Design a protein with these regions (language model features):
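Mature soluble binding/inhibitory domains
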Residues: 1-260
């Protein structure tokens, strides 16, 4: 019953990366890297705090979670879980100035997984606002290994930024599996916590990139993370990464963000 509720629609702009996960039955058979580019995220939040609509738009395709059209969106401490009527899933979080998440579009036996970050406005020069800052938040993703079923993941995220020098350390902790259909906790995946140091990238002052790694079973998986700073006073950060083990058999696609 939505009687008496008001609705607020927000628009976020950002970037994404993607990977195809090819399935054999319920198990992962192979991976192939796909496109990256611009992301547009549209969301509608009800006055009771629930999210009724989220649309992720990219040149590679759109995915819509609309509770008025057969989808479900459930909120939990770290963000929201979306499921379409054909069971494509999403894990995402919307902060005041930024949003981040992962979502999938399934065609036949292939699930294209997207991870991305977006916001309402970028901080043009964070160092002019604050020389250093600490951020805390969450990470949301999907962990896959050839021969096994995919596992959706959540974690705690932290970042320590030195905007004056243009560096930022990032890490996750308490990585755990989660069922999108039930919200149940699936246990610890702490070996898939990530860490790394990012540096200011390109001609702007609000984009940071660098390598992040985890050390599952003493066999490191790594990838490039991209993070951006959002808000009029550098209130939040959001980023994403796709990590792959050297032999190509394990992959962790995740997004992350935090506020100060």
């Amino acid at each position: 019953n939505t009687s008496g509720l008001s609705f607020t629609t927000s628009q976020y702009a950002g970037t994404y990366n993607s990977i195809d996960i090819n399935m054999s039955g319920s198990s992962v058979a192979s991976y192939s890297n796909q496109s990256s580019g611009n992301l547009s995220l549209t969301s509608t939040r009800r006055s009771d705090g629930l999210i009724s609509y989220a649309k992720f738009s990219t040149a590679a395709g759109d995915q819509t979670f609309d509770t008025n059209n057969g989808a479900t969106i459930a909120t939990f401490t770290k963000g929201a879980i979306g499921l379409t009527s054909n069971n494509d899933g999403a894990l995402f979080r919307l902060d005041t100035y930024s949003g981040y998440g992962m979502w999938e579009i399934t065609t036949g036996n292939t699930s294209r997984v997207f991870v991305g970050q977006s916001g309402t406005n970028l901080t043009s020069n964070p160092a002019a606002v604050v020389s250093s800052a600490s951020y805390t938040g969450y990470a949301l993703g999907i962990l896959t290994e050839i021969g096994y079923a995919p596992i959706f993941t959540t974690a705690d995220f932290s970042a320590t930024a030195n905007f004056s020098s243009g560096s930022m350390s990032v890490s996750t902790s308490n990585t755990r599996g989660i069922s999108l259909s039930t919200g149940n906790d699936l246990g610890s995946y702490s070996a898939d916590n990530i860490s790394g140091t990012l540096s200011k990238s390109g001609s702007n002052n609000y984009t940071y990139t660098g390598t992040v790694t985890s050390n599952y079973a003493s066999n490191s998986i790594s990838g490039t993370a991209t993070l951006q700073v959002y808000g009029p006073s550098a209130e939040s950060v959001a980023g994403s990464a796709i990590l792959t083990r050297g032999d190509g058999t394990r992959n962790h696609a995740l997004s992350f963000g935090g506020t100060r």
